[in-house]
């Protein structure tokens, strides 16, 4: 059981009425709280919840509607996303109770101050290195417009400016990260055909690929619903076509790909987690057509070349700078 869920269950007497659990982990919490429904924006956790508790959790960027008397937000990493989620939940709870639970190292003390916009926050419990806070919604706000919260910026590329639309919670929100900047300069001479932007975030790499290879079919994949929505907005802002899918890792990607291009993810909430990146290297060959290429950016200190060569083929370093390297390998 997730420690945050354990803290909630210590106070289960507070959750006897219809309850919405936002950002809930894929553990036994829904079994322990049969009156609760879930709202998830993580495709992997949603798939696990669907398998165990069919129909009891929804995958979306917007809060589900329902006759909730209270809601719990499991604190996400992003402050901007927390603001949006709290406002979304508060809008559904006039006169109701809004709870916030999170790890101390995840910033729950700081985040509890964000509850003050809706009433007087109270700390209810502290255990398992987590805290539980509560506020009664004195005045419910209007439901926030997610798209109005987007940050938009332009990238000057060789073939013209690219418009990027970034929603709260998306990696490197509102700016281009250094790894992607390096990879954008190394998109030349990719095989033609079906291209995948794996871990697409706001869709920067995918949009640049479609601009550079307009005849190619494009798929963008991310585990996060807000990233999926951001990528769709970025493609639309540039008049580009592409399929954007939500999936937990490379296993959810299409097969017979001409190329996989990636700035792979390495965070799961507040924790560093290289599992999705390592699984990409281990399974890329299964999703590439013969002669297909994996091209990715990674921190220089990560020992990826041996893993790439073990599972795919000879690994070349195409570029290096700012603490990052661009690796390339082809399926034989």
Curated annotation (Swiss-Prot):
It comes from the Bacteria. Its EC number is 2.1.1.172. Gene3D superfamilies: Vaccinia Virus protein VP39. It catalyses: guanosine(1207) in 16S rRNA + S-adenosyl-L-methionine = N(2)-methylguanosine(1207) in 16S rRNA + S-adenosyl-L-homocysteine + H(+). Keywords: Cytoplasm, Methyltransferase, rRNA processing, S-adenosyl-L-methionine, Transferase. It is found in: Cytoplasm. Belongs to the methyltransferase superfamily. RsmC family. The keyword Kinase does not apply. It comes from Pseudomonas aeruginosa (strain LESB58). This is Ribosomal RNA small subunit methyltransferase C.
């Amino acid at each position: 059981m997730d420690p945050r869920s354990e803290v909630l269950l210590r106070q289960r007497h507070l959750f006897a009425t219809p309850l919405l659990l936002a950002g809930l982990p894929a553990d036994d919490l829904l079994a322990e709280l049969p009156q609760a429904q879930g709202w998830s924006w993580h495709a992997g956790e949603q798939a696990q919840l669907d398998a165990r508790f069919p129909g009891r959790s929804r995958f979306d960027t917007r809060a589900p509607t329902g006759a909730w008397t209270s809601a719990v937000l499991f604190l996400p990493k992003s402050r901007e996303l927390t603001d949006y989620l709290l406002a979304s939940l508060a809008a559904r709870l006039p006169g109701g109770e809004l709870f916030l639970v999170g790890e101390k190292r995840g910033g729950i003390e700081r985040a509890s101050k964000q509850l003050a916009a809706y009433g007087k926050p109270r700390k209810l419990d502290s255990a398992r290195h987590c805290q539980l806070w509560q506020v009664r919604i004195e005045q419910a706000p209007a439901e926030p417009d997610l798209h109005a919260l987007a940050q938009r910026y332009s990238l000057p590329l060789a073939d013209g400016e690219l418009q990027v639309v970034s929603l709260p919670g998306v990696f490197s929100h509102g700016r281009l990260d250094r790894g992607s900047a390096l990879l954008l300069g190394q998109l030349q001479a990719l095989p033609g055909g079906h291209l995948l932007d794996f871990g697409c975030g706001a869709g920067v790499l995918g949009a640049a690929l479609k601009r550079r290879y307009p005849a190619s079919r494009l798929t963008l994949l991310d585990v996060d619903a807000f990233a999926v929505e951001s990528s769709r907005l970025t493609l639309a802002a540039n008049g580009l076509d592409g399929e954007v899918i939500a999936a937990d890792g490379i296993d959810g990607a299409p097969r017979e790909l001409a190329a996989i291009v990636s700035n792979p993810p390495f965070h799961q909430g507040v924790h560093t987690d290289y599992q999705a990146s390592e699984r990409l290297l281990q399974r890329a060959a299964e999703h590439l057509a013969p002669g297909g290429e994996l091209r990715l950016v990674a921190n220089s200190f990560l020992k990826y070349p041996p893993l790439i060569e073990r599972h795919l083929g000879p690994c070349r370093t195409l570029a290096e700078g700012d603490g990052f390297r661009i690796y390339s390998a082809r399926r034989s």
